[in-house]
């Protein structure tokens, strides 16, 4: 048996991992401006960094929205596609060892996948995720560089920007302590 390469070609980031003998090998994240460049860049970097030859790869499995742009085998290797929600559910089940769980996958957006035994079902999602952070940061901070955004966030305080229960009442509400957020960015006009 060779190495199975799994690649999630997302809306903003491509994730790649190898699996050999049921063991996960060195997950990697790669960003690029388009899905095809991101996919081939991630694949090349992954096999180079991990000293994997094409002859040692048993199969490549693609998922994610960007996989729709790929309609031929990668480098002549057996290549298949799988549903992203199924992959998220099976991956979470494998990593946790749990039979029933709710998987929250935050990528460009956020999806919710219900797992009960062998039944895996996408039950909804939000248009809020990493893409929201990058878009807001571009508009407000004039940058979409994730490392710069993270550095700025480390030096900020949510108490300066988010409205908390304590900001609107001196008494806790049933089930809501004073330090719970009442409104994200609720103090933005005051700062």
Residue map of PLM features:
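Conserved phosphate-binding catalytic cores of ATP/NTP-utilizing and phosphoryl-transfer enzymes
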Residues: 70-104, 108-119
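Short glycine-rich, Thr/Ser-proximal phosphate-binding strand/loop in the N-terminal lobe
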Residues: 3-41, 45, 120
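Flexible, glycine/proline-enriched loop segments at strand-loop-helix junctions
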Residues: 30, 78, 119-126, 134-139
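Short glycine-aspartate micro-motif
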Residues: 2-8, 57-61, 101-105, 125
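Phosphate/pyrophosphate-binding loops at sites that engage ATP/ADP/AMP, CoA/4′-phosphopantetheine
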Residues: 43-58, 191
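Active-site rim beta-loop-alpha module in soluble metabolic enzymes
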Residues: 138-191
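A short acidic Gly-Thr/Ser loop motif
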Residues: 8-13, 65, 104-109, 127-130
């Amino acid at each position: 048996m060779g190495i199975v390469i799994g690649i999630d070609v997302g809306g903003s980031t491509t994730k790649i991992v190898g699996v050999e003998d049921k063991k996960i090998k060195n997950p990697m994240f790669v960003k690029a401006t388009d899905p095809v460049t991101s996919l081939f860049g991630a694949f090349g970097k992954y096999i180079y960094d991990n000293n994997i030859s094409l002859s040692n790869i048993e199969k490549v499995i693609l998922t994610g929205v960007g996989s729709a742009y790929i309609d031929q085998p990668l480098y002549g290797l057996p290549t298949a596609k799988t549903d992203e929600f199924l992959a998220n559910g099976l991956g979470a089940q494998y990593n946790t060892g749990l039979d029933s769980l709710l998987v929250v996958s935050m990528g460009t957006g956020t999806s919710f996948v219900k797992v009960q035994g062998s039944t895996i079902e996408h039950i909804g999602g939000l248009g809020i995720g990493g893409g929201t952070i990058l878009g807001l940061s571009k508009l407000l901070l004039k940058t979409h560089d994730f490392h710069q955004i993270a550095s700025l966030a480390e030096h900020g305080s949510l108490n300066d920007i988010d409205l908390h229960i304590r900001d609107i009442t001196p008494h806790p509400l049933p089930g809501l302590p004073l330090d719970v957020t009442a409104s994200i960015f609720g103090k933005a006009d005051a700062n």
